Amino acid sequence: MQALEPQPPLASLDHEGLVISLGTFSKMLAPGLRVGWLRAPAALMRHLVVAKQATDLHSSSLAQRAISELLTRFDLEAHLATLRATYRDRCHVMADVVTASFPEGTHFECPDGGLFLWVELPRGLDTLALLTTAVTRHRVAYVPGAPFFVDRARSNTLRLNFSNCQPAAIVDGIASLGALFTEALQRELPAAAL
């Protein structure tokens, strides 16, 4: 399977009407566009509509009209192919810079889909503790990995988003993070050796 190759929806395998499919336009059109879609068996749809109405009455009419126009006038498949290629290229740029600039012992895998690189740094680094320095001194943000774990034991992990930045900014930002993590690890090594 190629990276970012679209897979058939799970609902296409459902022959008993048990699968509910939902999605969002935010990843394919605009991150701030909080409009999604839902496909469900008819028996469930009425209940789902009532649940949605109880939550927020309705989604933005303006956003829904804009999406309708886009889907009517533009080739969505061509747009998605361009996005996949763009995201694949940005992911590879980020992976190359992580490999070149992060401390030895860093592990990651390029995703087969999605917009994030999951990174495990050498033990002894705490990405939550380093986040403020990353943002204020290096002007780079990331998501610390510890909150993704029930016991928060993996404080040396982080999630990096490659969807929003141009390749040159990815190179600069990730190299800067690499310098921060390497410097922090060098400070930790003497203490770990005691």
Which sequence ranges carry the predicted segments?
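PLP-dependent class I/II
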Residues: 1-194
